Amino acid sequence: MQQRNRLEPYFENLVFERDDNKMVVNFGPQHPSAHGQLRLILEMDGEQITKAVPDIGYLHRGMEKMGENMIYNEFLPTTDRMDYIAATSNNYAFALAVERLLGIEDKVPRRAKVIRMILLELNRIISHLFWLATHALDVGAMSVFLYCFREREYAMDLIEDYCGARLTHSSVRIGGVPLDLPEGWLDRLNVYLNNLPDQIKLYEGLLTENRIWRMRLEEVGVIPPEMAKQWACSGIMLRGSGIEYDIRKEEPYELYDEVDFDIPVSDRCDSYGRYLLYMEEMRQSIRIIRQLIPMYKETEPQLMAHAPEYISAHKEDIMTQNYSLMQHFVLVTQGMRPPVGEVYVPTESPKGELGFFIRSEGEPYPYRLKIRAPSFWHTGILQDLLPGHYLADVVTIIGSTNIVFGEIDR
């Protein structure tokens, strides 16, 4: 008897009803509104979807396995390629997990923590502006796309001025940050923060009460609270279903317990409610950054943790002190050796809970590296979310989930 091929894609074993009234349609993986390499197999009765099966894997790069074959510092730039719209969030989540594994989280200098938080919240604004621009364009609002990219460009210029990269930042290091803020950077940041609230009002003026926008989003993609919990939704996908949960509040990291901000929640449970949350979250990020600016000015100019067994010394010390040079050589050529143990660290990325699980056996590279990416779960929910809707609503629903395939196909 012929043995079944275990690598056979599971969707080929799905049974679709074939009759004169139903048809099976492929949505993607080259569809411009698929937000990456998403393929949906849709069974349709006329224009109405009766069954939906997401098919992923078109961007798979073996990222977790790559992480298990690299020393810890080598893998950090690779995390940029997950959610490439918010690269700093990936860098930071991995760095924080390694720091907690090493036991040096509390040794990270306060200035480094402030800089990290500014970059994280600026990255959140960039990600939300990109979401709003592309989502509005998918639904047909061309002008909003242009306005959002204008403000996003200014924020990306700020990031570029700090780390030299526009998209894949690598702006965080295990143990701190590589650079202090450039001279005049905070002044330019203040100009941006003063201008952005008026621009958010402009976007809302174009969309919030727009009749077509509301018709396309209201009562579309409804996620009841129970469904959100069953599918492990997080971020705005969870808060948009009336569940108040934000890791920055529930399990504070860095200095989030020292800043004052609100958690926007909506009980609408639909795409329109999630849109309202994205707008409010940008305002909360502005509020957080405004509190961080005076905190930065009060800190000492130290950027990296002092942990010689894991973290290289300052460049000046490496060039002038024999011991620092030898330690640096060992760390670069062989890598740090964390103690035996395991850790899972969740963070609140712009799209939801981004967490890293690391299992160490005392070697310079992880024994096991597992990435918990929010977009993976938010893609899975489509099979329950799409049936009952019409084909025209598919683009709206995919847009409201805010998925990116760099972190789905790892």
From Swiss-Prot:
Highest taxon in the source lineage: Bacteria
Membrane topology: Peripheral membrane protein
GO molecular function terms listed in the Swiss-Prot or TrEMBL record: NAD binding; NADH:ubiquinone reductase (non-electrogenic) activity; quinone binding
Pfam families: Complex1_49kDa (PF00346)
Main localization, broad class: membrane
Key words of the record: Cell inner membrane, Cell membrane, Membrane, NAD, Quinone, Translocase, Transport, Ubiquinone
Gene Ontology cellular-component terms listed: plasma membrane
Enzyme class, spelled out: translocase
Subcellular location: Cell inner membrane
Family statement drawn from the similarity comment of this UniProt entry: Belongs to the complex I 49 kDa subunit family.
Subunit structure: NDH-1 is composed of 14 different subunits. Subunits NuoB, C, D, E, F, and G constitute the peripheral sector of the complex.
Function: NDH-1 shuttles electrons from NADH, via FMN and iron-sulfur (Fe-S) centers, to quinones in the respiratory chain. The immediate electron acceptor for the enzyme in this species is believed to be ubiquinone. Couples the redox reaction to proton translocation (for every two electrons transferred, four hydrogen ions are translocated across the cytoplasmic membrane), and thus conserves the redox energy in a proton gradient.
Cited PANTHER family: NADH DEHYDROGENASE [UBIQUINONE] IRON-SULFUR PROTEIN 2, MITOCHONDRIAL (PTHR11993:SF10), NADH-UBIQUINONE OXIDOREDUCTASE 49 KDA SUBUNIT (PTHR11993)
Name of this protein: NADH-quinone oxidoreductase subunit D
Organism this protein belongs to: Nitratiruptor sp. (strain SB155-2)
